[in-house]
């Protein structure tokens, strides 16, 4: 089975059904909330919350279902028959893709195989019924899921979003197709993995957690069903899917809403006071299952499961644990520590000897992904940076929401620009170990107009993932911005005008033209522009970047 909507640990998704259901629905795992404070009977309350979804005839008694919708979110269109969940009109998905057989059916959602008409490439399309989006929180959940998928785009073990579309009845999320089935299926088929294979799988899973956390995202619903195989013949071609319960977080932020799946939920989530450490707990539960075939906290009822989670006793006596290595058990204990402060971070898990043994995972610090993007950005020439700013300003809100969160977190004085001290403090919060000199280099690289600060558009341009550049409409729009007279060429005069508009002085225009101009006609055509934008960054703009850095040092 390919990409699928969420299901429970026991219930398998339907597959092979070619008939499209009359209604799609929002994909969601159990999402718990309670307006009451935690009490000694918390397990009873939580169990009741988990069972609410099974009482479909009691919707009128659920206060979450009668929250009025905010008008800016639920905008009516001219025919008064639908609203825009995404906040804007999108192309008709059926003009771009052909939807065919069903890949999976979850509790509230359906995923279909879809084929891009222009290229013939297959993707997965998750369809969400707008009729099921009852509250403003439901709408915000869908928006946030799309925003987070855009924010995490480019990681090798995270499913890639292709685009989001909306019509009068549904929201459709088109994403990379994972045709190899679920990791869940492999666990059921084999019962358990060898320690070596379990270590390799754990490295992938925790690598996703580390990437999410470094970019300010907490997944909150990790489980085997949410990892799919791209290739059924490759056990390790895993991709994380389903970010419907994921949220953006700031360092030190505390969450109180109870979400997740019973077997995998961390004790602090049940106690309504948690942070990203809960994802590490969940990954530890998955590791336990990979090695034994059963979850560590087991009971016949949900209340019993919650009691076991809160007690925190881990069974290492039953088979096969007597023959499992001490190193593996040590890692599990440290991932399943009941105290979040004593639990390993995702990065520390990747450095644990059991994971690192035989070179499975490198024992070195990993900078957050945003830093690698900044480093790539520093190698670009000025034209490419200006083009990125043009593209960044045209991106949809869902594509840049995560970066906006990071910018606002770093811009502590709300001035609309990041100073060196704010950049340094912000990078430290996101786990950076860069030296001051390296941060200065990043600052200089991102500060396109040499103002001494990084404004919002410069930050977005410097940190947006480069796969956004592959979209033809963005490249065309950026080229047309520079080609003022519509001649099909960017001339040195037009480049000069663009530099003035962006407040860039002392730019070596001739050098920029020479670096991009392949046929030596003294101007840049569209093909040369596209090649520059899509070319590997390591060899782009080094001479111009050195000149720019020299200018910055002279100005200083």
Curated annotation (Swiss-Prot):
Residues 26-39 have a biased composition (Low complexity). PANTHER family: SERINE/THREONINE-PROTEIN KINASE (PTHR24349). This is Calcium-dependent protein kinase 5. Ca(2+) 4 binds at residues 517, 519, 521, 523, 528. Residues 8-25 have a biased composition (Basic and acidic residues). It is an enzyme of class 2 (transferase). The modification Phosphoserine is found at residue 261. Ca(2+) 3 binds at residues 483, 485, 487, 494. Ca(2+) 1 binds at residues 411, 413, 415, 422. It catalyses: L-seryl-[protein] + ATP = O-phospho-L-seryl-[protein] + ADP + H(+); L-threonyl-[protein] + ATP = O-phospho-L-threonyl-[protein] + ADP + H(+). Signal peptide: none annotated. Activated by calcium. Autophosphorylation may play an important role in the regulation of the kinase activity. Belongs to the protein kinase superfamily. Ser/Thr protein kinase family. CDPK subfamily. It is a lipid-anchor. Residues 361-391 are annotated as: Autoinhibitory domain. GO terms for cellular component: cytosol; membrane; plasma membrane. Residues 97-355 form the Protein kinase domain. It is found in: Membrane. It comes from Arabidopsis thaliana (Mouse-ear cress). The keyword Amino-acid biosynthesis does not apply.
């Amino acid at each position: 089975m390919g990409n699928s909507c969420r299901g429970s640990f026991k219930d398998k998704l339907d597959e092979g059904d070619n008939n499209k259901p009359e209604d799609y629905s929002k994909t969601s795992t159990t999402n718990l909330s309670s307006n009451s404070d935690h009490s000694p009977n918390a397990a009873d309350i939580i169990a009741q919350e988990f069972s609410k979804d099974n009482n479909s005839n009691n919707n009128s008694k659920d206060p979450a279902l009668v929250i009025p919708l905010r008008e800016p979110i639920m905008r009516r269109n001219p025919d008064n028959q639908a609203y825009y969940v995404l906040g804007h009109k999108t192309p008709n998905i059926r003009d771009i893709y052909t939807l065919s057989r069903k890949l999976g059916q979850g509790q509230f959602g359906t995923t279909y195989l879809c084929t891009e008409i222009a290229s013939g490439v297959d993707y997965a399309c998750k369809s969400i019924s707008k009729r099921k989006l009852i509250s403003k929180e439901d709408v915000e959940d869908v928006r946030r899921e799309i925003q987070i998928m855009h924010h995490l785009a480019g990681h090798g073990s995270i499913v890639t979003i292709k685009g989001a579309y909306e019509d009068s009845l549904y929201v459709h999320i088109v994403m990379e197709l994972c045709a190899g089935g679920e990791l869940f299926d492999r666990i059921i088929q084999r019962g358990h993995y060898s320690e070596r294979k379990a270590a390799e799988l754990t490295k992938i899973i925790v690598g996703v957690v580390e990437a999410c956390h470094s970019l300010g995202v907490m997944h909150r619903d990790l489980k085997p069903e949410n990892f799919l195989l791209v290739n059924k013949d490759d056990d390790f071609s895993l991709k994380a899917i389903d970010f419907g319960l994921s949220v953006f977080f700031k360092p030190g932020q505390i969450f109180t809403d109870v979400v997740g799946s019973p077997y995998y939920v961390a004790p602090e989530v049940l106690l309504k006071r948690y942070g990203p450490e809960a994802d590490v707990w969940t990954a530890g539960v998955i590791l336990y299952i990979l090695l034994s075939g059963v979850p560590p906290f087991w009971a016949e009822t949900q209340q019993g499961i919650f009691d076991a989670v809160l007690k925190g006793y881990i069974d290492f006596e039953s088979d096969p644990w007597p023959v499992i290595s001490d190193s593996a058990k040590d890692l599990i204990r440290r991932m399943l520590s009941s105290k979040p402060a004593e639990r390993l971070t995702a990065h520390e898990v990747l450095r644990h000897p059991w994971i690192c043994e035989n070179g499975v995972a490198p024992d070195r610090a990993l900078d957050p992904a945003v830093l690698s993007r900044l480093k790539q950005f520093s190698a670009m020439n000025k034209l490419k940076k200006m083009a990125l700013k043009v593209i960044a300003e045209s991106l949809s809100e869902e594509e840049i929401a995560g970066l906006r969160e990071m910018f606002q977190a770093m811009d502590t004085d709300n001035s609309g620009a990041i100073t060196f001290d704010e950049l340094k403090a912000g990078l430290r919060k996101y786990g950076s170990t860069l030296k001051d000199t390296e941060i200065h280099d990043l600052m200089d690289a991102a500060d396109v107009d040499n103002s001494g600060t990084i404004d919002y558009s410069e930050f977005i341009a410097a940190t947006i993932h480069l796969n956004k550049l592959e979209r033809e409409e963005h490249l065309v729009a950026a080229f047309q911005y520079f080609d003022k007279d519509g001649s099909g060429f960017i001339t040195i005069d037009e480049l000069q005008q663009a530099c003035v508009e962006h407040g860039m002085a002392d730019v070596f225009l001739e050098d920029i033209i020479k670096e991009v101009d392949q046929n030596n006609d003294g101007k840049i055509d569209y093909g040369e522009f596209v090649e520059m934008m899509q070319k590997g960054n390591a060899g782009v703009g080094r001479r111009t970047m050195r000149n720019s850095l020299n200018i910055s040092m002279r100005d200083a």
